[in-house]
């Protein structure tokens, strides 16, 4: 009787490789509508197309908040400024009689000396596109939130301004800021409560909104974080 032959059978294990897509790091423009903005950085450097842009000065954090970071000792201010900035500039210029608004939810931390950083501005510009004074700056100073509002249209660097306390002891908490222009009047609300209302019929310049990190210091580091930023 013939003995059946034994044929060894070997199972070959198949190793499968799957291409796993690498997560692409998010940038501010993936969360915030920045199509109408440009940014000014130390250098000075200007980035006009913010789609897909981020840097050490301007980025999105893990909470998907828009962050502005700056060492105030860096060099490279804009021609008319004493301090460097990481700051957005809205591209639309408008007149005082128009209906305009900026809404922001923002907080700031700093080791600046002096401890003062501007987070929102209405800046002036002349009809022939030359720089004019800022009409309004909303700034954190040693943990308190202030509005600094021009009281004349004098085209001078240190023209008179009114300093208005908006929130005492804010510290590093988030705050909601509404800046509204309507019928020649400026209204500022903090966390939904109206704090300022002024007639600005005296103001002769065109204007535009700014938002970001603009320290009034040359020493220390500042970080400004926006959860929300919209204009109309």
Predicted regions and their residues:
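Short, aromatic/His-centered strand-loop micro-motif at the edge of beta-sheets
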Residues: 147-176
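Secretory/extracellular carbohydrate-interaction modules
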Residues: 65-146
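Sec/Tat signal peptide C-region and signal peptidase I cleavage site
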Residues: 21-25
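Ligand-recognition surfaces built from glycine- and aromatic
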Residues: 28-32, 99-101, 114-115, 200-232
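Solvent-exposed N-terminal domain segments of exported/luminal and surface proteins
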Residues: 26-87
């Amino acid at each position: 009787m013939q003995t059946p032959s034994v044929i060894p059978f070997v199972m070959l294990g198949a190793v499968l490789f799957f291409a796993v897509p690498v997560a692409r790091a998010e940038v501010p423009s993936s969360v915030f509508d920045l199509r109408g903005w440009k940014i000014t950085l130390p250098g000075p450097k200007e980035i006009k197309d913010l789609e897909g842009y981020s840097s050490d000065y301007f980025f999105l954090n893990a909470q998907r908040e828009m962050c502005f970071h700056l060492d105030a000792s860096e060099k490279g201010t804009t021609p008319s400024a004493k301090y460097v900035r990481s700051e957005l500039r809205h591209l639309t210029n408008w007149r005082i009689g128009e209906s305009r608004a900026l809404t922001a939810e923002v907080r700031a931390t700093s080791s600046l000396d002096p401890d003062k950083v501007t987070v929102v501005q209405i800046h002036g510009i002349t009809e022939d596109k030359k720089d004019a004074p800022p009409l309004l700056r909303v700034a954190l100073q040693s943990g308190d939130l202030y509005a600094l509002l021009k009281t004349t249209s004098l085209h001078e660097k240190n023209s008179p301004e009114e300093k208005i306390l908006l929130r005492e002891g804010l510290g590093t908490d988030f705050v909601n800021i509404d800046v509204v222009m309507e019928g020649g009047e400026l209204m500022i609300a903090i966390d939904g409560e109206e704090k300022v209302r002024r007639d600005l019929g005296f103001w002769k310049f065109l204007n535009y909104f700014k938002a970001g990190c603009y320290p009034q210091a040359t020493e220390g580091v500042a970080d400004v974080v926006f959860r929300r930023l919209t204009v109309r």
